Design a protein with these regions (language model features):
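An alpha-helical, amphipathic repeat domain used for nucleic-acid recognition
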Residues: 1-184
Length: 184
């Protein structure tokens, strides 16, 4: 079984970045998965476990170097990734908390994620909450006026989605025409 050389890792990184935007941590994770698959195949082919472990260690260091090289070349930009993802998630009705959690899971540093949420093209929390209401057909987008139990359930739904109580109440109390105008 051939070794995983730096050129193969570089080609794998380019192939991934040609199809997907990624953070540096995400690219390292993709390359690590490739190395792990290679190690599993090498073990099944009967290679020496110590040789496999040494090759995995070398390839992991090389993968980190490839990811760093992609950052220096501008092919990977965590700030741009965070801004684009925050804009998309907030526009789809995700709360600030949910967006920050998603970006953290993707490997974006907390300060970059917070800065991305403050971008002028990123919808604010109230707008995102209205989008969530529209998607779930609650609040101003409900078919009928809610009773107290239904309203409490809607508040719970928005709270589980990460919206604060004040924003959720304001969104639920917004008249439908105003909500539609705000989202237009």
């Amino acid at each position: 079984m051939p070794r995983i050389d730096d050129a193969a890792l570089h080609e794998a990184a380019l192939a991934h970045l040609a199809r997907f935007s990624a953070t540096e941590a995400g690219l390292r994770r993709v390359l690590s998965n490739r190395i792990r698959r290679w190690a599993r195949a090498a073990g099944q082919a009967g290679q020496d476990p110590e040789a496999i472990a040494a090759e995995v260690a070398r390839a992991t260091a090389a993968a980190a170097a490839v990811a760093a090289r992609m950052v220096r070349a501008g092919a990977v930009d965590d700030a741009a990734f965070a801004a684009a993802r925050a804009r998309r998630l907030r526009g789809a009705g995700r709360s600030g908390r949910a967006t920050l959690a998603h970006l953290a899971q993707k490997g974006v540093a907390a300060e970059l994620a917070a800065a991305a949420l403050q971008g002028e093209e990123v919808p604010d929390e109230f707008h995102a909450c209205l989008v969530a209401c529209r998607r779930r057909r609650i609040g101003p987008f409900a078919a009928a006026a809610p009773g107290p139990d239904t309203r409490r359930k809607w508040l719970g739904t928005l709270a589980r989605a990460g919206f604060g109580g004040e924003v959720a109440r304001r969104a639920l109390d917004t008249p439908r025409a105003e909500a539609e105008a705000r989202l237009a």
